[in-house]
Amino acid sequence: MRLPGVPLARPALLLLLPLLAPLLGTGAPAELRVRVRLPDGQVTEESLQADSDADSISLELRKPDGTLVSFTADFKKDVKVFRALILGELEKGQSQFQALCFVTQLQHNEIIPSEAMAKLRQKNPRAVRQAEEVRGLEHLHMDVAVNFSQGALLSPHLHNVCAEAVDAIYTRQEDVRFWLEQGVDSSVFEALPKASEQAELPRCRQVGDHGKPCVCRYGLSLAWYPCMLKYCHSRDRPTPYKCGIRSCQKSYSFDFYVPQRQLCLWDEDPYPG
């Protein structure tokens, strides 16, 4: 009999293959490359890496405009890091690229465990994948800066991931409180103008003077990531077993303080939501 709510095993394009794990070696980083469909319909390649020794997962994709977006989940430290490398428009006098990092608390039910990710394989590498579930837009107000020189105290991944964004690493007061309770040193965090002061500042897209401070907004999307394990039932097994993953898409919108409008030149058009 099939247990209620548990599907029968059937061929899948993405499978958990525990028998292949020994071939990789214990804890060896594993990489999976998949073709994914972006929210605007275009297709790009996404790289997913899992390191079960470090208990971390990283995801990277390039947007059609050349922006490189990455996401790192550090399960040991309860930290997730978003990074965007945004290409500048040289004809407008912008720098070659601008880097941003956003650091928030990781909830362990947001993405599958690193051990499961390391065992993920695909049967058809040419298939274009589209997320099964679209999760709602999450709007975050980043009101604290992270001190890059002390960032390793928060997560050892910060130095590599945010190396190009030394002066543009942001987090939130509520995340800071959580990490301080976990024993993270306060020297990791630096004050930005208070929320009440930032509330009085205009949005950058409303500011014409490139030297004026303002509140910048940046949006990014994780087009496809394994957010949940699937369980199947077989007549040969008394209990459900892991047999695949459920994929999700999620978008984020970050508001943060910049001392000069020049540091937020992309925030020109009205942002949805």
UniProtKB/Swiss-Prot annotation:
Key words of the record: Signal
Organism lineage: Eukaryota, Metazoa, Chordata, Craniata, Vertebrata
Pfam families membership: OAF_C (PF22873), OAF_N (PF14941)
Disulfide bonds: none
Highest taxon of the lineage: Eukaryota
Coiled-coil portions: none
Organism field: Homo sapiens
Family as reported in the entry's similarity comment: Belongs to the OAF family.
Signal peptide annotation: 1-27
InterPro entries noted in UniProt: Oaf (IPR026315), Oaf_C (IPR053897), OAF_N (IPR053894)
The protein, known as: Out at first protein homolog
